[in-house]
Curated annotation (Swiss-Prot):
SUPFAM superfamilies: S13-like H2TH domain. GO terms for molecular function: rRNA binding; structural constituent of ribosome; tRNA binding. GO terms for biological process: translation. This is Small ribosomal subunit protein uS13. Keywords: Ribonucleoprotein, Ribosomal protein, RNA-binding, rRNA-binding, tRNA-binding. It comes from Campylobacter jejuni subsp. jejuni serotype O:2 (strain ATCC 700819 / NCTC 11168).
Length: 121
């Protein structure tokens, strides 16, 4: 099993899809990396030689922010929005949708389980 950027890639998948298991690398970026390194998209992860895996590791390390560093950067960006007091920061703080979706109905993922308000007994 190839280990790249601290992630074990699935052995039997094609390398272009295997790289997408790394946080911060999607299909487009995966193909860009493979083009730059000169590896075919059709190659399977378990078919990679040690030199090819090292070349992919080097390319990702030098040119892309992935995994822990990227997660940390995203968290810091959200914290900065909240500290600024921007509209988006307030929405993050309140746990509501940030991108203008309606909230009278739906938005359950962000709002959580329904809470009954003002039930009379």
């Amino acid at each position: 099993m190839a280990r790249i950027a601290g992630v074990d890639l699935p052995k039997k998948k094609r390398i272009e899809y295997g790289l997408t298991y790394i946080y911060g690398i999607g299909l487009f970026t995966s193909r860009k990396i493979l083009d730059k390194v000169g590896i075919s998209y059709d190659k399977r992860v378990h078919e990679l030689s040690e030199d090819e895996a090292a070349a992919i590791r080097k390319e990702i390390q030098e040119n892309y922010m992935v995994e822990g560093d990227l997660r940390k950067q995203v968290a810091m960006d959200i914290k900065a929005l909240m500290d600024l007091g921007s509209f988006r920061g307030l929405r993050h703080r309140k746990g509501l949708p940030v991108r203008g979706q309606k909230t009278k109905t739906n938005a359950r993922t962000r709002k959580g389980k329904r809470k009954t308000v003002g039930a009379k007994s």
